[in-house]
């Protein structure tokens, strides 16, 4: 009703951009006739204009003024370099991002290309732009692919990857545009604020940031703070004992009601992800461990037992983690990717290692931490893009002050979303999924099946293998991760079946008929690897659809070849390469391989180096390197031959209905379901989607409550018969909304608590940066000393008492504790002075004593006082900050209980946290001044 009266606010927003789009189109006509060099000079012209402005506001208004022409320049460069022209709706997306908003753009609408527009415009300031992706693979791909446009226009493009050394990182951060993942940016920020020297800092001041898949980073990952930790010593034997003990404990089936424990040793709350021992469980555990009290401070066991229970019940192998090389590696619940190097904190990871009988790594202590919310709020200007933001619009607005604008699609969406099929049992659901997959596959349509865990993907793989359906598996298992790009490249081919764990953030569009460009790259790599790549790295041939896979809980048939039958092989969609190359092309490729061996050496390249050469050759950027030129010609030759077959395949796939997407479980968030649906019907293509669910699915089981339990009893239908019910659909939507609200509250709470830490963190980090910059260190230390003198006077002088009753003897002895050079100071020297005069007198004495100390030290070691000042301030700041982080963690745990005493835990946390921070800063100042006066540089050795 209100929309009709007032108009849709999103439409009103979009109308503002239409005149700007017209301006870009007018500029585009003027640029057509320019040479490449003339087009490139526009960059330096823009930059020279920006150099003349003096304030940030002036700079921003000039950028707005330059926007139409700058966008037209990027569009023209993209046409020349990539052969891709930004659509008008993509220009609108770029304008939304430049204004510091979130652009919601559907899958396949070219978000990656959109990011080039605001990135180029804002990089003209020379202060750096960060383009953030969810994983290293996407950062690398975008830097190579979209970076061509920026390099063509004369801008430098950087890439930060997990394996890079600090010097390399620094060089890449100094580029005009830097591609990186959210975690690399966050960890580099924390490491920079632990640096002992200015030369170790790799990042510049933040300016403008574009986040791809912004909902994944700012919403999904916001529950997990970034933590840098150091090792602490704790008994590893206790983890093993606790793991053995909990195996003998029995889980309670019911939950406690009215304070009465259920039968069993412990309760599990899957919603809160917690395990609680019952009274009976406490008694049994103490008996099994042969201890009197699990909470005994001298011999604490409760922490170990709780973690062991959570490891047993809530952390599931092949769902939450996989075991690889004697390690438990976390699987990201949103993207389905493994996260090597990341560990659960507070002893939880050690409990999982004990459960799996792996080597137990030492426990860690937090050295530095920040949440993604507070990290990204450090950027003066922040923007993001995603296919699904509208459902989280309120959170973006409240937490990040980011508005969301829905950008229209270039073509009308033709996708059909079929009605959900709900089954009573999980087993029936999986049989139905396998049947629909096989049926659609038989029609020659590609099928993408989204699963929620490694375990479930392998279960479906086994069911499809039994039905002789060739398929590819894309999950967190290392052997599958390595094949990710290959698998996605062929996922749109006729009859292709792809099982993928959580497609969120996969970043690669599924092209109907297959991706000829990527297949050509794979082919050239296959040909060149055997001749050019180092023997120890070997070459893994491109993957073909599998029929048999190893699967947990299923018996593997021995001696069965994984390759498909001859009958199936004849179907074009079953091979990674659509057609054998002609003899002429084969001969040219063999000749090229021999030539490159002479140029680059026999088996002398790493696999990554060869990838780099191939990626550069696949670009359209001008190059003088003759080897790259020849590689480029070879890739085009292969691509042309593949294109002939694949274009026909694309026509056939469109004719039979396009890509079919199957969801096998509702995610906790409707947004992630929409992301999976969005894989079908990209850019106006035909496509369809369907979700298969069961009443035993986690979402309904944990959050559906008693209503779903009642439904299970009410539906007296066959197991394999799908259920359709309005009440069931409402229960499902209600459960999802309940989960979204629940997790939003968790993120809000994390943000509110970290906001307290954030102000303290900013104060500590700015103090550190000032020290590293070496600005007026002496004045800073003297300032610390003067504050200490004031605090001593405040502690020992009570103005309510007459001066003769002031405890000047103790005051003087306290001053001497800090400044031993004032050994001649006597209480009688202070007689007759009022409180303020006392402070001024002691401050003056401190300054004189510090000058004496400096003169004495500098005489034998010139310049060492500044080094000592820097060392002691950093040492004290870092040590006390580390201890403070632990104290704040303990405080956070303890204030939670105060809610029972009608006190707001957050206010208690703020007040006590503030007092603790002030105390920390007081201790830091006192320790520094004490250390500086006690400092005795080592005597230089005099050679005989």
From Swiss-Prot:
SMART domains associated with the record: SecA_DEAD, SecA_PP_bind
Q: What biological processes does GO assign it?
A: intracellular protein transmembrane transport; protein import; protein targeting; protein transport by the Sec complex
**According to its UniProt entry, what is the function of this protein?**
Part of the Sec protein translocase complex. Interacts with the SecYEG preprotein conducting channel. Has a central role in coupling the hydrolysis of ATP to the transfer of proteins into and across the cell membrane, serving as an ATP-driven molecular motor driving the stepwise translocation of polypeptide chains across the membrane.
Select a single GO molecular function from the record's annotations and give it: protein-exporting ATPase activity
The protein's name: Protein translocase subunit SecA
Cross-referenced InterPro entries, in alphabetical order? Helicase_ATP-bd, P-loop_NTPase, SecA, SecA_CS, SecA_DEAD, SecA_motor_DEAD, SecA_preprotein_X-link_dom, SecA_SF2_C
Its record classes its membrane topology as: Peripheral membrane protein
Places the protein is found: Cell inner membrane; Cellular thylakoid membrane; Cytoplasm
Q: Which Pfam families match?
A: P-loop_SecA, SecA_DEAD, SecA_PP_bind, SecA_SW
Q: What is the lineage of its organism?
A: Bacteria, Bacillati, Cyanobacteriota, Cyanophyceae, Synechococcales
């Amino acid at each position: 009703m209100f929309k009709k009266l007032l108009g849709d606010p999103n439409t009103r927003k979009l109308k503002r951009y239409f005149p700007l789009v017209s301006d870009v189109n007018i500029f585009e006509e003027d640029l057509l006739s320019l040479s490449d060099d003339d087009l490139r000079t526009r960059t330096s012209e823009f930059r020279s204009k920006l150099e003349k402005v003096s304030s940030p506001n002036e700079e921003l208004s000039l950028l707005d003024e330059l926007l139409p022409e700058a966008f037209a320049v990027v569009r023209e460069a993209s046409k020349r370099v990539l052969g891709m022209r930004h659509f008008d709706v993509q220009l609108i997306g770029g304008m939304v991002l430049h204004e510091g908003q979130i652009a919601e753009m559907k899958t396949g609408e070219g978000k990656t290309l959109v990011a080039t527009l605001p990135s180029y415009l804002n990089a003209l300031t020379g202060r750096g732009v960060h383009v953030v992706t969810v994983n290293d693979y996407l950062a690398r791909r975008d830097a190579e692919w979209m970076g061509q446009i920026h390099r063509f226009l004369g801008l430098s493009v950087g890439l930060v990857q997990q394996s890079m050394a600090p010097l390399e990182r620094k060089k890449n951060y100094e580029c005009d545009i830097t591609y990186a993942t959210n975690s690399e940016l966050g960890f580099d920020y924390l490491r920079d604020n632990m640096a002992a020297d200015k030369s170790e800092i790799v990042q510049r001041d933040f300016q403008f940031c574009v986040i791809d898949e912004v909902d994944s980073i700012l919403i999904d990952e916001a529950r997990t703070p970034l933590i840098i930790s150091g090792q602490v010593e704790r008994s590893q034997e206790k983890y093993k004992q606790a793991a053995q003990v909990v195996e003998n404990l029995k889980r309670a089936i019911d939950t406690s009601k009215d304070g009465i424990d259920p039968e069993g040793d412990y309760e599990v709350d899957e919603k809160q992800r917690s395990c609680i021992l019952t009274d009976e469980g406490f008694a049994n555990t103490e008996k099994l461990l042969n201890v009197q009290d699990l909470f005994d401070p001298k011999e604490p066991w409760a922490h170990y037992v709780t973690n062991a229970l959570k490891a047993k019940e809530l952390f599931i192998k092949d769902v939450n983690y996989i075991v690889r090389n004697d390690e438990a590696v976390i699987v990201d619940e949103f993207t389905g990717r493994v996260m090597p190097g990341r560990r659960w904190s507070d002893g939880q990871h050690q409990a999982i290692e004990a459960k799996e009988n792996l080597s137990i790594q030492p426990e860690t202590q937090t050295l530095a931490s920040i949440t993604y919310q507070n990290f990204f709020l450090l950027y003066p200007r922040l923007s993001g893009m995603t296919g699904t933001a509208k459902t989280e619009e309120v959170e973006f607005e409240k937490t990040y002050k980011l508005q969301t604008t829905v950008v229209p699609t270039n073509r009308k969406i033709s996708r059909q979303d079929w009605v959900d099929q709900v089954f009573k049992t999980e087993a029936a659901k999986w049989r139905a999924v396998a049947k629909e997959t096989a049926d659609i596959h038989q029609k020659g349509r590609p099928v993408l099946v989204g699963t929620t865990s490694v375990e479930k993907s392998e279960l479906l793989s086994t069911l499809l293998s039994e039905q002789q359906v060739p398929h590819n598996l894309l999950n967190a298992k290392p052997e599958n991760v390595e094949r990710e790009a290959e698998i996605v490249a062929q996922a749109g081919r006729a009859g292709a079946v792809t099982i993928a764990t959580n497609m969120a953030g996969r970043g690669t569009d599924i092209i109907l008929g297959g991706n000829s460009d990527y297949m050509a790259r794979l082919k050239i790599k296959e040909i060149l690897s055997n001749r050019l790549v180092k023997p120890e790295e070997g070459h893994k041939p491109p993957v073909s659809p599998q029929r048999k896979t190893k699967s947990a809980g299923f018996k593997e048939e021995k001696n069965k070849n994984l390759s498909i039958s001859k009958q199936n092989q004849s179907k074009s969609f079953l091979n990674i390469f659509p057609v054998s190359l002609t003899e002429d092309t084969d001969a040219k490729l063999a000749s090229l391989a021999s030539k490159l061996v002479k140029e680059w050496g026999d088996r002398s390249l790493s696999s990554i180096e060869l990838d780099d050469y191939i990626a550069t050759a696949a670009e359209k950027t001008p190059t003088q390197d003759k080897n790259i030129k020849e590689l480029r010609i070879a890739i085009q030759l292969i691509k042309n031959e593949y294109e002939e077959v694949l274009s026909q395949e694309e026509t056939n796939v469109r004719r039979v209905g396009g890509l079919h997407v199957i969801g096998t479980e509702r995610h906790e968030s409707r947004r992630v379901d929409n992301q999976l649906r969005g894989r079908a019907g990209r850019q106006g293509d035909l496509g369809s989607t369907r979700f298969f669910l069961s009443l035993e699915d986690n979402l309904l089981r944990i959050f559906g409550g008693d209503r779903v339990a009642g439904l299970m009893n009410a539906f007296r239908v066959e197991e394999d018969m799908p259920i359709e019910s309005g009440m069931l659909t409402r229960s499902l939507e209600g459960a999802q909304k309940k989960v979204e609200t629940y997790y939003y509250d968790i993120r809000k709470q994390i943000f509110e608590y970290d906001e307290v830490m954030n102000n303290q963190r900013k104060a500590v980090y700015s103090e550190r940066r000032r020290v590293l910059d070496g600005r007026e260190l002496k004045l800073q230390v003297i300032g610390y000393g003067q504050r200490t003198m004031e605090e001593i006077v405040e502690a020992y002088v009570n103005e309510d008492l007459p001066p003769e009753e002031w405890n000047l003897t103790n005051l003087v002895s306290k001053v001497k504790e800090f400044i031993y050079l004032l050994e001649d100071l006597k209480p009688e020297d202070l007689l007759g002075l009022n409180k303020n005069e006392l402070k001024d007198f002691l401050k003056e004495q401190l300054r004189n004593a510090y000058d004496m100390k400096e003169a004495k030290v500098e005489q034998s070691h010139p310049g060492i006082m500044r080094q000592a000042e820097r060392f002691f301030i950093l040492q004290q700041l870092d040590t006390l900050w580390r201890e403070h982080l632990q104290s704040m963690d303990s405080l956070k745990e303890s204030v939670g209980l105060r809610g029972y005493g009608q006190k707001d835990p957050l206010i208690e946390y703020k007040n006590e946290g503030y007092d603790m921070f002030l105390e920390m800063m007081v201790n830091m100042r006192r320790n520094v001044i004490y250390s500086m006066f006690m400092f005795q540089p080592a005597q230089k050795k005099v050679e005989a």
